[in-house]
């Protein structure tokens, strides 16, 4: 067997092992009528990354807040709730990255309504990705009147990041905007605007009972303060003159 053949066999096995080593989709009850779904993906430079989203139940209907990373896990998530008697009424994506939108194409193929802001759809189109079938504009949007509110605090992690507020439960899904322990991937971030956006979010939802970030543990409203501090720190660091290379 040639060295090249051995290399490709090793590469294939490594990829297969990495895929098999990803944890299974997790679905956990957070509050009455609110579930956290957690999917996992191998991300270059970051290793295996967990991503949280929500499923909100309104009577016999279920709404997805962000899809899992993949179509496969999105199908698993939908099936889990359908088997328990719920109709999947729609999905909303909090920004254009794949950890929020990876299941849109599968949902569209099943005629399940998908929602995103006009800006998110524009960014998806720019990237050659499948767009949500429904879009909205403005700072506020009610996915379900008095039950599921979407709010745009301004640019931060991405230009289009929105959060989702559940007023009856006082639960805020902050998604990838909430970064209490470090700003993470800054590839599409607006460092200059993030502190102002974070301050607005803190003032609006400072009495939230629970705050759900995308990539760290669920916490209380203190995560809003920590995110603001990280955003300010990131802005200050961006203003420091770079050290000359030797």
UniProtKB/Swiss-Prot annotation:
Changing residue 99 to A: Almost abolishes catalytic activity against cephaloridine and imipenem; drastically reduces catalytic activity against nitrocefin and benzylpenicillin. Only one Zn(II) ion is retained in the active site, in vitro. Belongs to the metallo-beta-lactamase superfamily. Class-B beta-lactamase family. Its cofactor is Zn(2+). The class B beta-lactamase family has a specific amino-acid numbering system known as BBL, for standard numbering of class B beta-lactamases. A multiple sequence alignment was used to derive a consensus sequence and then the consensus was numbered taking into account insertions and deletions. This allows use of identical numbers, e.g. for active site residues, despite differences in protein length. UniProt always uses natural numbering of residues, hence there appear to be differences in numbering between this entry and some papers. Zn(2+) 2 binds at residues 99, 176, 215. It comes from Serratia marcescens. Monomer. The keyword Transcription regulation does not apply. It catalyses: a beta-lactam + H2O = a substituted beta-amino acid. This is Metallo-beta-lactamase IMP-1.
């Amino acid at each position: 067997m040639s060295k090249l053949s051995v290399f490709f066999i090793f590469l294939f096995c490594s990829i297969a092992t990495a895929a098999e080593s990803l944890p299974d989709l997790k679905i956990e009850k957070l509050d009455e009528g609110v579930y956290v779904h957690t999917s996992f993906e191998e991300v270059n430079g970051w290793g295996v990354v967990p991503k949280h989203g929500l499923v909100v139940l309104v009577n016999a209907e279920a709404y997805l807040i962000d899809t899992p990373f993949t179509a496969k896990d999105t199908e698993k998530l939908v099936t889990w709730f359908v088997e328990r008697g719920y109709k999947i009424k729609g999905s909303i994506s909090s920004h254009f990255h794949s950890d929020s939108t990876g299941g849109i194409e599968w949902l569209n193929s099943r005629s399940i309504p998908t929602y995103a802001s006009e800006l998110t759809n524009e960014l998806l189109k720019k990237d050659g990705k499948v767009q949500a079938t429904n879009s909205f504009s403005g700072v506020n949007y009610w996915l379900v009147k008095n039950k599921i509110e979407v709010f745009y605090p301004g640019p931060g992690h991405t230009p289009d990041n929105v959060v989702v507020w559940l007023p009856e439960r006082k639960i805020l899904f902050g998604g990838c905007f909430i970064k209490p322990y470090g700003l993470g991937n800054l590839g599409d971030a607006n460092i200059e605007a993030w502190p102002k956006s974070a301050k607005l979010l803190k003032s609006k939802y400072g009495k939230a009972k629970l705050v759900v970030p995308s990539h760290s543990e669920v916490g209380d409203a203190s995560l809003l303060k920590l995110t603001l501090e990280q955003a300010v720190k990131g802005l200050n660091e961006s203003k420091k003159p770079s050290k000359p290379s030797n």
